[in-house]
Amino acid sequence: KKSFVTKHNYSLLRLTINSNEFHDEKNYLIEISIKDNSKKIQNLNFKIKVHHTASIPKLIDSNFFYTNWFNINKMEEKHTLKRWSDKWYKMLEKYAKIMADGRQNCIIIPGELISLKNNKIHLDEDKMISFINVFRKNGFKYFESPHLLGRGKNDDWGSPELITNLRGRGYFSEEAKKDIDTIIRKIKKFTKKNNLTNQWLQHIADEPTDNNAECYKQVSKQIRAIYPEIKIMEATNAKESLNGAIDFWCPIINDFQENEEFFRSREKIGEKVLIYTCLVPGGKWLNRTLDMERIRQVYFGWAGSKYNTFGYLHWGLNQYKADPFKQSVVKHPSPIASPTNYLPAGDTHIIYPGKDGPLSSLRFEAHRKGIEDYELLEILKSKNKRKHSKIVKKLFLDYENYSTSISKYRRIKRKLLKSL
């Protein structure tokens, strides 16, 4: 028996029980008593049915790729930390653990670790491997590089030329090409030395378009000439114009669903496809904003199993633009955003800064539940594809058509567990 005492009029409590606590395949009863000055107000009873025939693989063994982009500046700001200090690493461990508990298995590398030192490009190998090792220890499988180029300070979506993030040089200049050459050679040396070749995912520029696709392809060609084994991954807006430049495609879900034939053609030649959402799409499309049903986040795992996609990406683990406890809708940060362009509720984050570390959220836990469902569905698929398809169709048809009935979800989930 455990007790918790609060002096506040209103409290939100979360009960988490490790599955290792359940040793036998039977029913368990959990009773929660709510009291006021020793006077019982209400009893809450929860029944748990254990299915030992079903098991979730360890994070390192998961085949579902999942990344939420992590902002170390916000971690430091919210917890008053000095970068690279002992306290900083202890807090980083807490953030790595909460991500791992949510089934996240990829982390983006801080951009500052590739910097200018005495006007020369420097990759801080010691700090980079110390950062990576915190996440390795927690079962992370993939590591995303910082983006090497972008649309420049003015966020120019119409320009055909990408701009280097380090020095602000247009890629078509010889100086920019030399910078990319230097960075990739340093990345190659670092990843080979630390046995990261198969875990390193190289970003070039976020959301390339038809306008800058030719430039993007030239960068990709240069990188592969230096480091042929490297895998290039990108959240994409363009399609055919980027053919041959990307190994891991990451279209937004409506782009994937409306152009599935194109992405299947890329898979046939050995490329992978995962999906992402951000401030869009809205309506009935799956997304994870605060004003949507939690069941939508669960279905990202079901979609992965139905479509055989590689995983899911989102830009907002903790990209706070305001106090997340007070304001969930914020102005779009782009310098070219119109005065009425706002990010939807909760788009910037899915965890919260607590007093002593990060706090999970219902959305984050729903997403975790969906990825765990993915693992179970994949086991069933390997045993009985027909039954797998039948179970998925009872809840999820596509990214716009799915059941929002929690009772139906639980009923079908029980069928899934019994099928294993």
Q: Which residue stretches match the model-derived regions?
A:
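Short, glycine/acidic-rich beta->alpha junctions
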Residues: 24, 90-91, 123-127, 215, ...
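Extracellular Ig-like/FN3 beta-sandwich strand-entry sites
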Residues: 10, 25-29
